[in-house]
């Protein structure tokens, strides 16, 4: 919840900041999360 936080790149690295953003790959436009759990 809150893709704005994921855009920073934190959720991109796998940090538990935004599971939805990192899991969906919205937070990382160039590096989508390979793990569908945001972990």
From Swiss-Prot:
Q: Describe its PTM?
A: O-linked glycans consist of galactosyl-beta(1-3)-N-acetylgalactosamine (Gal-GalNAc). The synthetic non-glycosylated form shows higher potency on natriuretic receptors (EC(50)=672.90 nM) and NPR2 (EC(50)=261.0 nM).
Pfam families in the cross-refs: ANP
For biological process, the GO terms are: regulation of blood pressure; vasodilation
Primary localization class, coarse: secreted
Give the highest taxon in the source lineage: Eukaryota
- Segments passing through the bilayer: none
Q: Which UniProt keywords apply?
A: Disulfide bond, Glycoprotein, Hypotensive agent, Secreted, Toxin, Vasoactive, Vasodilator
Propeptide found at: 1-8
SS bonds (residue pairs): 12-28
Can the keyword DNA-binding be found in this entry's annotation? no
Q: What do the Gene Ontology cellular component annotations say? A: extracellular region
Q: Which InterPro entries match?
A: Natr_peptide, Natr_peptide_CS
Q: Look up the further comments and give them.
A: The synthetic glycopeptide is highly stable in rat plasma even after 48 hours. The synthetic non-glycosylated form shows similar stability. This stability is probably due to its C-terminal tail.
Its family? Belongs to the natriuretic peptide family.
What function is annotated for this protein?
Snake venom natriuretic peptide that targets both NPR1 (EC(50)=1080.0 nM) and NPR2 (EC(50)=328.60 nM). Exhibits hypotensive and vasodepressor activities.
Name of protein: Natriuretic peptide TcNPa
Q: Which organism is it from?
A: Tropidechis carinatus (Australian rough-scaled snake)
């Amino acid at each position: 919840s809150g893709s704005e936080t994921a855009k920073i790149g934190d959720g991109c690295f796998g940090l538990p900041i935004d599971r939805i953003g990192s899991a969906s790959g919205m937070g990382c436009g160039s590096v989508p999360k390979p793990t569908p759990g945001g972990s």
